[in-house]
From Swiss-Prot:
Identification of the protein by name: 38 kDa cell wall protein
Organism from which the protein derives: Solanum lycopersicum (Tomato)
Subcellular location: Secreted, Cell wall
CC terms in the record's Gene Ontology section: extracellular region
Main location: secreted
Amino acid sequence: VKIGTYELLKGDFSV
């Protein structure tokens, strides 16, 4: 997934 604020909020830390 994308590394970004929105992604981090969703809990996605995958590269």
